[in-house]
Each structure stands twice: as structure tokens, then as C-alpha cells.
Amino acid sequence: MEPVDPNIEPWNQPGSQPKTACNQCYCKKCCYHCQLCFLQKGLGICYGREKRRQRTTTPYASKNHKDPIPKQPLPQARGDPTGPKESKKEVESKTKTDP
């Protein structure tokens, strides 16, 4: 494509830029407004500086992560230490009453 006027830069040639300015509308007509609009709006390609995104946390999600581990009951020794003594007493009392 030959420039119309060789003394003018290619980006200033007639027809190289649209007559209307770019806008924030995403309709079909505005997406095909110019090459820049097509890349950004139509294809979603933007070569600009990316902004940092802040994490959005919900109170429900943060609550789940902060729950402490449920406490487990303390391990108990097998058999009750007072159990065998009582059972012996019960056996002795039963044997005494039975004869």
C-alpha cells in the first residue's frame, strides 16, 4: 500500500485513523471501530500495564481456614483402675450371700 503523500508519516495519512474517538462501548459497531478497538474489545488483547488484583475473601471462606483442629479426648488407660477392686468386692459379696 503506497502512502498518499510521502512527506506525511504513515500514521497521519488520510484514512489511517477513524474520525471518531475510541470509547468504552463494547457493541459490535464499536468493536470494529479501529484495529486497536478490535484487539482490545473484540479479542480481549491488551498490551497495557497490568494492575495488581486484590484478593477478595469472603468471611465464610476465611472462617473455614481459621478453624482450630477439634480437640480429641485424652487417651485413657485400658480398664478402670478402680474397676477390678470393685468387681472383686462385688464377687466376694455375691459369694457370701449365695451359700
UniProtKB/Swiss-Prot annotation:
<keyword id="KW-1048">Host nucleus</keyword>
<dbReference type="GO" id="GO:0039502">
    <property type="term" value="P:symbiont-mediated suppression of host type I interferon-mediated signaling pathway"/>
</dbReference>
<keyword id="KW-0053">Apoptosis</keyword>
<feature type="binding site">
    <location>
        <position position="34"/>
    </location>
    <ligand>
        <name>Zn(2+) 1</name>
    </ligand>
</feature>
<dbReference type="GO" id="GO:0050434">
    <property type="term" value="P:positive regulation of viral transcription"/>
</dbReference>
<keyword id="KW-0014">AIDS</keyword>
<keyword id="KW-1126">Modulation of host PP1 activity by virus</keyword>
<keyword id="KW-0862">Zinc</keyword>
<dbReference type="GO" id="GO:0030332">
    <property type="term" value="F:cyclin binding"/>
</dbReference>
<feature type="region of interest" description="Core">
    <location>
        <begin position="38"/>
        <end position="48"/>
    </location>
</feature>
<keyword id="KW-0899">Viral immunoevasion</keyword>
<dbReference type="InterPro" id="IPR036963">
    <property type="entry name" value="Tat_dom_sf"/>
</dbReference>
<dbReference type="GO" id="GO:0046872">
    <property type="term" value="F:metal ion binding"/>
</dbReference>
<dbReference type="GO" id="GO:0001070">
    <property type="term" value="F:RNA-binding transcription regulator activity"/>
</dbReference>
<keyword id="KW-1090">Inhibition of host innate immune response by virus</keyword>
<feature type="modified residue" description="N6-acetyllysine; by host PCAF">
    <location>
        <position position="28"/>
    </location>
</feature>
<feature type="binding site">
    <location>
        <position position="30"/>
    </location>
    <ligand>
        <name>Zn(2+) 2</name>
    </ligand>
</feature>
<keyword id="KW-1122">Modulation of host chromatin by virus</keyword>
<keyword id="KW-0922">Interferon antiviral system evasion</keyword>
<keyword id="KW-1035">Host cytoplasm</keyword>
<protein>
    <recommendedName>
        <fullName>Protein Tat</fullName>
    </recommendedName>
</protein>
<feature type="site" description="Essential for Tat translocation through the endosomal membrane">
    <location>
        <position position="11"/>
    </location>
</feature>
<dbReference type="GO" id="GO:1990970">
    <property type="term" value="F:trans-activation response element binding"/>
</dbReference>
<feature type="modified residue" description="Asymmetric dimethylarginine; by host PRMT6">
    <location>
        <position position="52"/>
    </location>
</feature>
<keyword id="KW-0010">Activator</keyword>
<keyword id="KW-0945">Host-virus interaction</keyword>
<feature type="binding site">
    <location>
        <position position="22"/>
    </location>
    <ligand>
        <name>Zn(2+) 1</name>
    </ligand>
</feature>
<dbReference type="InterPro" id="IPR001831">
    <property type="entry name" value="IV_Tat"/>
</dbReference>
<dbReference type="GO" id="GO:0004865">
    <property type="term" value="F:protein serine/threonine phosphatase inhibitor activity"/>
</dbReference>
<feature type="modified residue" description="Asymmetric dimethylarginine; by host PRMT6">
    <location>
        <position position="53"/>
    </location>
</feature>
<dbReference type="GO" id="GO:0042805">
    <property type="term" value="F:actinin binding"/>
</dbReference>
<feature type="short sequence motif" description="Nuclear localization signal, RNA-binding (TAR), and protein transduction">
    <location>
        <begin position="49"/>
        <end position="57"/>
    </location>
</feature>
<keyword id="KW-0488">Methylation</keyword>
<dbReference type="GO" id="GO:0005576">
    <property type="term" value="C:extracellular region"/>
</dbReference>
<feature type="region of interest" description="Disordered">
    <location>
        <begin position="54"/>
        <end position="99"/>
    </location>
</feature>
<keyword id="KW-0964">Secreted</keyword>
<dbReference type="GO" id="GO:0044196">
    <property type="term" value="C:host cell nucleolus"/>
</dbReference>
<comment type="function">
    <text>Transcriptional activator that increases RNA Pol II processivity, thereby increasing the level of full-length viral transcripts. Recognizes a hairpin structure at the 5'-LTR of the nascent viral mRNAs referred to as the transactivation responsive RNA element (TAR) and recruits the cyclin T1-CDK9 complex (P-TEFb complex) that will in turn hyperphosphorylate the RNA polymerase II to allow efficient elongation. The CDK9 component of P-TEFb and other Tat-activated kinases hyperphosphorylate the C-terminus of RNA Pol II that becomes stabilized and much more processive.</text>
</comment>
<dbReference type="GO" id="GO:0030430">
    <property type="term" value="C:host cell cytoplasm"/>
</dbReference>
<feature type="region of interest" description="Disordered">
    <location>
        <begin position="1"/>
        <end position="20"/>
    </location>
</feature>
<feature type="modified residue" description="N6-acetyllysine; by host EP300 and GCN5L2">
    <location>
        <position position="51"/>
    </location>
</feature>
<keyword id="KW-1017">Isopeptide bond</keyword>
